[in-house]
Curated annotation (Swiss-Prot):
Disulfide bonds: none annotated. Pfam families: LRR_14 (PF23598), NB-ARC (PF00931), WH_DRP (PF23559). GO terms for molecular function: ADP binding; ATP binding. GO terms for biological process: defense response. Residues 138-441 form the NB-ARC domain. ATP binds at residues 180-187. Residues 132-153 are annotated as: Disordered. Keywords: ATP-binding, Coiled coil, Leucine-rich repeat, Nucleotide-binding, Plant defense, Repeat. This is Probable disease resistance protein At1g61190. LRR repeats lie at residues 516-537, 538-559, 562-585, 586-608, 609-631. Residues 20-68 form a coiled coil.
Length: 967
């Protein structure tokens, strides 16, 4: 039989429990009423929750931080809401259990428990609703904890730090890039910016510092950022990149953050990482450093800031700090030597620091002299150069994607230290060396060359001076040493590149193995003769320009069958090529400009591959007989030579079927007789034309013309006629949508004394440089009456970068009203006493900080009339001195060594202007040695337009001029 359990309960207890169940809190009796109340109160609570959430969102958009009590309340509401939905979802079933008009239940215990839950939840909802009336829902965020990054004291970066910080803090700037060459101090400056966030307090919620470096992967960047955000646990690491990006975005989207990316080499995809894009709404910031300016544009910063090398005095201060006072004071001679060593670093902080630390303990004068010798002769051999400096710079070289671009970069090391390299000449040589490809069209190849040049500039491997971008580039001396180090196979094959440019050589250097030499540069020395025999069977490039060469031995070039580029220019006493020139069967580039060559050798016709031949300024060359045999010739310059466009020249040139670019002087006959050749002319000088009126219509057919000089021509009016629908019309009525001179970028008008205006230049819409000088009747540049029908269609000077006005005594107006000058960087006005107003208003020039006005005499500045006060305030600071003081040392060899008192001054001139301006001499005396005379003169700050030639080191002057100076 089964077991029985007996529980004894008194009747009074049972009755008491039943009464409490039915009558106490009324969990069963009031269930239906409580459910209705709960539903109503919950709706009110949700409305209150929505209001609080809206308040919080508004405050957080202002970068306020929600109160912790508010967040707790919102969390409780969310929890209660879920519980309420659960209870209400089963309410129909629970109500069916009631009986006796809701006073009792068929399932008393079950209904009692449910009713109790409803009652308690109703109390909680009512309480939460009353607590939701917050006076404040947010507070200012606490000061962000930015851990300062260790950094050494800096010298010379204070101004750059201020500019970079101010720009980053601008409301409209969300992304800012700093670019500059390796070792220039970008990371140091970046650390200073980072540490300023620690000083300024809680403007931002979080500042994230990430070192990217070359080859960094997306996953690595996400992991580094996640660590800063405390996301990087084991679970997070196992997520894919997309989910990681979602997590990063979720954390950062509610924060005002700063992301600092140091040393990026390519575009960083912020979206793929999960970084909310900075905007004026979220006020977040992304800053980065890079060596490549191209990356700045890819990242969205189209006005990046360049970190440049230190100015000389700042560089000296940094170097002194590294060397130490004890060493500098150990011998009075050492200070001067130390300055020389510091100058070798050219303001590069990396080199200044490393070399300064190396020299810190060296107290013997001989040690410093040895350092100067090594840094001058072969800096790569200097202690620590190959370990601490060159490898860091080499990263920029390694990042170049194209092997041809790398070759172009190494090629620039053939030029002297701190040399201003002419870009046109450089690119022409690149074309012949095969760096630019196989394109047979010179214009396309040249454009490709400029693209490659731009790549090197953006990579900060080359630099350019503001205002001279199109003409010259510079390779930093330490970067040049890196290039030579690479070219010599990191010092293992030093005779690959024999570069002894501008080092004072009087004869060619001794080479152990001529057969190993690939490229040789002996330019800018004092070599007079090369008579030795050399078996340079592998030589492809030979630079001998700017020497005092008189004789080039045929034996020296006999074995140079692979020679591609030969530059003999600027040897004023060189008058004859050896017949062995015919053996240079691979030669593609030959430059004989500025020599005294009298005739072309018979053997020249054997140079079947010759593409470029430069014979400009060969004043003794009377004939180009035989040049027609150079069937591959594509580029020929006869400018300022003694060869003119007569019938014999025309016959020779007509047979050059591949010729694409011709530069010649006084060739009206050539232009009229052969339209094909006329179309090839790119630079033209016209002198002594006496037509009245002067008809420029024949120039309209010269599709390739970009440089024009009109000199000593007497005419009062210029006519331009174009054919349109078989009808000739004057230049005032031709279709301005089809300008006559679409390619003309440089124009010089000189000594045209009957010319009154230059209104015709309206039909040269791409004019970049305009130079008008010594024309006494010019009263206005654009005549309003002549141009009135055109100015509604044509806006003049939209491509103009430089305007030079000199010796125009009647000039009163450039243009009658203010004009926009989107590209103008320089206006030079000298001896134009009646010019009182420039065509400028406050909005004419977009970048006034890069704009200069130079006037002489200086008092004319005070007589200028301005459009309004805003215009005056904007441009008055742009007015700079015009006259520069030069010191010239004459060595008696037909050259003048020019030393500018301002080392940053970049001096240009035309050879035929030198004598004109020597009336500016203010002092003349012999130097202390008695070996040369010293000339002080004031020279106009001048820009090269159509016929630019750099005379940074040497000026060639006629001997009779020098003799007259020495009297």
């Amino acid at each position: 039989m089964g077991n029985f359990v007996c529980i004894e309960i008194s009747g009074d207890q049972m009755l008491d429990r039943i009464i409490r169940c039915l009558c106490g809190k009324g969990y069963i009796r009031n269930l239906e009423k409580n459910l209705r109340a709960l539903q109503r109160e919950m709706e009110d609570l949700r409305a209150t929750q929505h209001e609080v959430q809206n308040k919080v969102a508004r405050e957080e958009s202002r970068h306020q931080q929600r109160l912790e009590a508010v967040q707790v309340w919102l969390d409780r509401v969310n929890s209660i809401d879920i519980e309420c939905k659960d209870l209400l979802s089963v309410s129909p079933v629970e109500l069916q259990k009631l009986c006796l008009c809701g006073l009792c239940s068929k399932y008393v215990c079950s209904s009692y428990k449910y009713g109790k839950r409803v009652f308690l939840l109703l109390e909680e909802v009512t309480k939460l609703k009353s607590e939701g009336n917050f006076d404040e829902v947010s507070q200012p965020p606490p000061r962000s904890e930015v851990e300062e990054r260790p950094t050494q004291p800096t010298i010379g970066q204070e101004e750059m730090l201020k500019k970079a910080w101010n720009r980053l803090m601008e409301d409209g700037v969300g992304i800012m890039g700093l670019h500059g060459m390796g070792g220039v101090g970008k990371t140091t400056l970046f650390k200073k910016i980072h540490n300023k966030f620690a000083e300024t307090g809680g403007t931002f919620d979080i500042v994230i510092w990430i070192v990217v470096s070359q080859g960094a992967k997306l996953s690595k960047l996400q992991e580094d950022i996640a660590e800063k955000l405390h996301l990087c646990d084991d679970l997070w690491k196992n997520k894919n990149e997309s989910d990681k990006a979602t997590d990063i975005h979720r954390v950062l989207k509610g924060k005002r953050f700063v992301l600092m990316l140091d040393d990026i080499w390519e575009k960083v995809d912020l979206e793929a990482i999960g970084i909310p894009y900075p905007s004026e709404v979220n006020k977040c910031k992304v800053a980065f450093t890079t060596r490549d300016q191209k990356v700045c544009g890819q990242m969205g910063d189209h006005k990046p800031m360049q970190v440049k090398c230190l100015e000389p005095e700042d560089a000296w201060e940094l170097f002194k700090n590294k060397v130490g006072d004890n060493t500098l004071r150990s011998d009075p001679v050492i200070v001067g030597l130390a300055r020389e060593v510091a100058q070798k670093c050219r303001g590069l902080p990396l080199a200044l620091s490393c070399i300064g630390e190396t020299m810190a303990s060296k107290t013997m004068v001989q040690e410093w002299e040895h350092a100067i010798d090594v840094l001058t002769r072969s800096a790569a051999e200097f202690s620590d150069m190959q370990n601490k400096i060159l490898p860091i710079l080499k990263y920029s070289y390694d990042s170049l994607e194209d092997e041809h671009i790398k070759s172009c970069f190494l090629y620039c090391a053939l030029f002297p230290e701190d040399d201003k390299i002419d870009t046109k000449t450089l690119i022409n040589k690149w074309i012949c060396e095969g760096f630019i490809g196989e394109d047979q069209v010179i214009k396309r190849a040249r454009n490709k060359g400029y693209e490659m040049l731009g790549t090197l500039i953006r990579a900060n491997l080359l630099t350019n001076d503001r205002g001279f971008v199109k003409w010259h580039v510079v390779m930093h001396d330490v970067v040049r040493e890196m290039a030579l180090w690479i070219a010599s196979d990191f010092g293992k094959q030093k005779e690959n590149y024999v570069v002894r440019a501008r080092v004072g050589l009087h004869e060619i250097p001794k080479v152990k193995d001529w057969g190993a030499v690939r490229r040789m540069s002996l330019m800018m020395n004092e070599i007079e003769e090369i008579t030795c025999e050399s078996k340079c069977s592998e030589l492809t490039t030979l630079f001998l320009q700017s020497n005092q060469l008189k004789n080039l031995s045929g034996e020296f070039i006999r074995y140079m069958q692979k020679l591609v580029v030969l530059d003999l220019s600027h040897n004023p006493d060189f008058n004859e090529l050896p017949e062995q020139i015919s053996g240079l069967v691979s030669l593609q580039y030959l430059d004989l400009s500025w020599t005294r060559i009298e005739q072309l050798p018979v053997g020249l016709k054997e140079l079947k591959k010759l593409i470029f031949l430069n014979l400009c300024f060969t004043e003794r060359l009377c004939s180009i007989s035989g040049i027609s045999r150079l069937l591959s010739l594509r580029w020929l310059s006869l400018r300022e030579s003694n060869v003119h466009g007569d019938a014999s020249v025309l016959k020779e040139l007509q047979q050059l079927e591949n010729l694409q670019d011709l530069r010649i002087t006084e060739s009206a006959e050539l232009i009229s007789l052969d339209q094909r050749l006329a179309k090839l002319i790119s630079v033209l000088r016209i002198e002594g034309f006496l037509q009245k009126p002067f008809d420029l219509s024949f120039l309209a057919s010269m599709e390739n013309l970009y440089g024009l000089l009109v000199e000593n021509s007497y005419f009062s009016e210029i006519n331009i006629k174009c054919r349109e629908s078989e009808t000739e019309s004057s230049y005032l009525h031709i279709n301005p949508k089809i300008p006559c001179f679409t390619n003309l970028t440089g124009l010089i008008i000189m000594k045209c004394h009957s010319m009154k205006d230059l209104t015709w230049i309206l039909f040269a819409p791409n004019l970049v440089n305009l130079d008008i000088r010594d024309s006494r009747e010019v009263g206005e540049i654009i005549n309003k009456e002549k141009a009135i029908n055109l100015t509604s269609i044509i806006t003049p000077f939209q491509k103009l970068e430089r305007l030079f006005l000199y010796g125009l005594p009647k000039l009163e107006s450039i243009y009658w009203s203010p004009l926009p000058f989107p590209l103008l960087s320089n206006i030079v006005v000298k001896y134009c006493p009646k010019l009182r107003k420039l065509p400028l208003n406050a909005t004419s020039v977009p970048l006034v900080e890069e704009f200069e006005i130079r006037m002489d005499p200086p008092e004319q500045e005070n007589e200028l009339e301005w459009e309004d006060e805003d215009t005056k305030n904007r441009f008055l600071p742009s007015i700079k001195p015009l006259v520069r003081r030069l010191k010239i040392h004459y060595s008696g060899m037909g050259f003048l060594n020019v030393k500018n008192q301002n080392p940053r001054f970049f001096f240009y001139c035309f050879i035929y202007l030198l004598v004109v301006h020597l009336d500016c001499i203010i002092d003349l005396h012999s130097d202390t040695s008695g070996m040369c005379c010293v000339v002080h003169l004031d020279y106009v700050f001048h820009f090269p337009f159509v016929f630019p030639k750099t005379f940074c080191i040497l000026f060639r002057l006629h001997f009779y001029t020098i003799k007259s100076l020495c009297v």
